[in-house]
């Protein structure tokens, strides 16, 4: 998957595809989760080439950008590790020498681990040569070129390069490998190869001369957009104002220091994977009216930590600094909060409730994907099935954790007692047994507990709730283990 996503950077073929248009409307989360026909490579190109006019609503532009990122990375289908591999592989293809880019393309590398193993073996691309054409050097795939059939001018160029092939490839640097386009197509040269007939088209050639800055997304995409605007009528908006580095994605244009972005590794195991990159990808039809009223003169910019960390239910979305109305929402990878905060005389800002509410139990959530997954607890829908035992799950990540029980994989190890766990959240809870930490406190009696589940069971003592009912008699219990112990007292259960 990572190699497929990075190929749009390395080959530059997707940028010339006809019909690439930005999404015109914001699709619902259910549409995004079920739309498996969208080519991730096309979404990747649309995401990188996205731009919006100055007159457009920055909030709507930010939502479109969020949708494109969601369709490219597909956090509802991929794990955090796979998404990280996609991003790292993309940057690798941008910043590394062309020799290594060819190595990735030839071997079909799927992950960073595979790429690391490939580089450790000191493998180098084969069947590729450096060709000089009209004063520029290109890395070209060999195709049984017969020098006798080539024109004298081209033959002399090829001979000059062939004598220095090994040294030329080894001396390439990341900054020496791109002109205004990362990947260029040579013009036709007649009678150069029998295999290609009278026309020789270097359709996968890589220019190895140019400006080091051309490797960065901004300059490359701006020039690609200018050259392809006539060929691609779907991209009619002005040139994208893309950042020079990933840190500029979260830096405010006023010159303020960028907020600290929470790592994807900090996402809890029970957090829906779709919320890693989707903050507010879309709304239900009932919430669409509220979403359209977000174009206020001043809009809030949420805290960056809300991208990857699940917020407690019922609490307000963190709110950061505001931006001027003329600024486009292009410097953030998450969507804004549901509404701008209302200023009060005392200087405090009102806390807004999470915008997405369940119509069954009225539970509220910070992003729509959490609400979609929560509704499955009411409908009983379990889309993901284990192919070994047939057990079904509501979330893909739950299925992936379950499959570790079959494979025996326990990637998380306690550094104190060396006990291993299948999930990071289990390890986090286990470490409290060594530290003695009890972060969960009962509001009624101030008793503290190590685990959240223990607190919930304890709170039923105060509320009198007994959700576990016996099917053989009217008795009910506050704990599941008490119900199971009671069921053994019935004759039918004992005989079985």
From Swiss-Prot:
CDD domains: SCAN (cd07936). Residues 219-232, 250-259 have a biased composition (Basic and acidic residues). It comes from Homo sapiens. Residues 293-311 have a biased composition (Polar residues). Pfam families: SCAN, zf-C2H2, zf-met. A zinc finger (C2H2-type) spans 356-378, 384-406, 412-434, 440-462, 468-490. Keywords: DNA-binding, Isopeptide bond, Metal-binding, Nucleus, Repeat, Transcription, Transcription regulation, Ubl conjugation, Zinc, Zinc-finger. Changing residue 146 to Q: In a colorectal cancer sample; somatic mutation. Coiled coil: none annotated. This is Zinc finger and SCAN domain-containing protein 5A.
